């Protein structure tokens, strides 16, 4: 296991561009593969999760050419995928396995999906159950709750599904299945999750309708290849936003970040805490809003976080916890039970790590209470095999009284292979 240490910084200064958005990168491969004609993708995130998706489609007969800058996908059309000769390994990627489950349920062949030991613990019935209502034949451990999943493709029928959780993965799995289903497939949620799938479906020419409650996909219509430019991932930018806010004297410009409104909960939360983050040169790229983010160090204060903002910031909560621990006053996080079924239980993991660094934290069933003191101590902590836990604690080390060492950091390559190099570039020590 590789351990990394983060030492106190005097400031963060300069300009960076974070890698391409992980969610959009996944979807570009999936839709490009089942579209007719050629799709090009620039800005693709070459993290382990996205490579797992890429390898899955190559295993199903899709030709993907990579010159190091741009992917060229030779789409096979809705019914052109072929059966993989082996089990498809999704690694640590929940997005890969859940979205592929929806897509594979409608194919004319047999598929087995698995993943690493962390992914095999994560809940899958949330996609298996509604897909089964559509007519899918899916078998898995623990009555379909856990991977590996064995999927026998068969004709599907559209349904109206009211999801009990606001999950873009659940919604997107059903949308992908809905492309093949007889009739309309409608998905509603308690709070609207990120809408990258809806935007990209439109970009590829799918027939769908959206409203305030959800999305409806009409099956049986072919997609056409498109050119896609993937913006920088706001979930990756979040580590640098918080780092610059908590280290006095910092000023950092992050260029070309996706600012889709369903993903900008992190910006709203940091602004409510008193953080200075400006959106510059706002524009649209491949159907997605993009901006440059200028962040300056700020005195943060504790706030209450809950409700609709939670699904808009669900992946950023580990680093939000770091900001809260270094703020003045109490931060209450609620309505975030989904954090307990991520790559690890992120509520328990961040509570344990920040307590080890001297923070006062009380766990609740759906969140935590953080008593901000503006101070953390140097310590050695665990990543729990979770890339966002690892990076969040390395950010904490920039503003701690001593070095914070994180063990088992190979997981960072899941989403942000260049994280430490960018951190070294802008940290003034």
From Swiss-Prot:
EC code: 2.5.1.19
First-tier enzyme category under EC: transferase
GO biological process: amino acid biosynthetic process; aromatic amino acid family biosynthetic process; chorismate biosynthetic process
Predominant location category: cytoplasm
Active site per UniProt: 315 (proton acceptor)
Molecular function GO labels: 3-phosphoshikimate 1-carboxyvinyltransferase activity
Annotated PROSITE patterns: EPSP_SYNTHASE_1, EPSP_SYNTHASE_2
UniProt GO cellular component terms: cytoplasm
Positions of phosphoenolpyruvate binding: 22, 94, 122, 169, 346, 388
Keyword Amino-acid biosynthesis listed: yes
Xref: InterPro entries: Enolpyruvate_Tfrase_dom, Enolpyruvate_Tfrase_sf, EPSP_synthase, EPSP_synthase_CS, RNA3'P_cycl/enolpyr_Trfase_a/b
Annotated keywords: Amino-acid biosynthesis, Aromatic amino acid biosynthesis, Cytoplasm, Transferase
Subcellular location: Cytoplasm
Pathway per the UniProt entry: Metabolic intermediate biosynthesis; chorismate biosynthesis; chorismate from D-erythrose 4-phosphate and phosphoenolpyruvate: step 6/7
Keyword Transferase attached: yes
Record-stated family: Belongs to the EPSP synthase family.
Quaternary context: Monomer.
Chain's role: Catalyzes the transfer of the enolpyruvyl moiety of phosphoenolpyruvate (PEP) to the 5-hydroxyl of shikimate-3-phosphate (S3P) to produce enolpyruvyl shikimate-3-phosphate and inorganic phosphate.
Protein name as catalogued: 3-phosphoshikimate 1-carboxyvinyltransferase
Protein source organism: Geobacter sulfurreducens (strain ATCC 51573 / DSM 12127 / PCA)
Gene symbol of the encoding locus: aroA
């Amino acid at each position: 296991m590789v351990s990394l240490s983060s030492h106190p910084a005097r400031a963060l200064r300069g300009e960076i561009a974070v890698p391409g958005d992980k969610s959009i990168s996944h979807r570009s491969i999936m839709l490009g593969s089942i579209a007719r004609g050629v799709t090009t993708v620039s800005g693709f995130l070459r993290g382990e999760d996205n490579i797992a998706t890429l390898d899955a489609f190559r295993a199903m007969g899709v030709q993907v050419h990579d010159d190091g800058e741009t992917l060229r996908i030779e789409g096979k059309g809705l019914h052109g995928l072929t059966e993989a000769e082996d089990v498809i390994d999704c690694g640590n990627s929940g997005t890969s396995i859940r979205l592929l489950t929806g897509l594979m349920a409608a194919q004319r062949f047999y598929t087995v999906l698995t993943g690493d030991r962390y992914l095999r613990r994560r809940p899958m019935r949330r996609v298996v159950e509604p897909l089964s209502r559509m007519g899918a034949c899916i078998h898995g451990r623990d009555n379909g709750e856990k991977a590996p999943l064995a999927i026998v493709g068969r004709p599907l029928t559209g349904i109206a599904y009211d999801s009990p959780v606001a999950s873009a993965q659940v919604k997107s799995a059903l949308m992908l299945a809905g492309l093949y289903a007889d009739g309309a497939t409608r998905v509603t949620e308690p709070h609207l999750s990120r809408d990258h799938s809806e935007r990209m479906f439109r970009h590829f020419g799918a027939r769908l309708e959206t409203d305030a409650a959800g999305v409806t996909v009409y099956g049986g219509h072919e997609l056409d290849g498109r050119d896609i430019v993937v913006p920088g991932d706001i979930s990756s930018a979040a580590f640098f936003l918080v780092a610059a806010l908590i280290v006095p004297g910092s000023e950092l410009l992050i260029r070309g970040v996706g600012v889709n409104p369903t993903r900008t909960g992190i910006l709203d939360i940091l602004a409510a805490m008193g953080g200075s983050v400006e959106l510059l040169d706002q524009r649209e790229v491949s159907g997605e809003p993009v901006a440059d983010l200028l962040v300056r160090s700020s005195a943060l204060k504790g706030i209450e976080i809950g409700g609709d903002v939670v699904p808009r910031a669900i992946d950023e909560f580990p680093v939000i916890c770091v900001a809260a621990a270094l703020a003045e006053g109490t931060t209450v996080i609620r309505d975030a039970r989904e954090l307990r079924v991520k790559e690890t239980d992120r509520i328990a993991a961040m509570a344990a790590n920040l307590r080890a660094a001297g923070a006062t934290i009380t766990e609740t069933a759906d969140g935590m209470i953080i008593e901000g003191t503006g101070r953390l101590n140097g310590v050695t902590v665990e990543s729990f095999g979770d890339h966002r836990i690892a990076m969040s604690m390395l950010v904490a080390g920039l503003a701690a009284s001593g070095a914070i060492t994180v063990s088992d950091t190979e997981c960072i390559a899941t989403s942000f292979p260049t994280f430490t190099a960018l951190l070294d570039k802008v940290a003034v020590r």
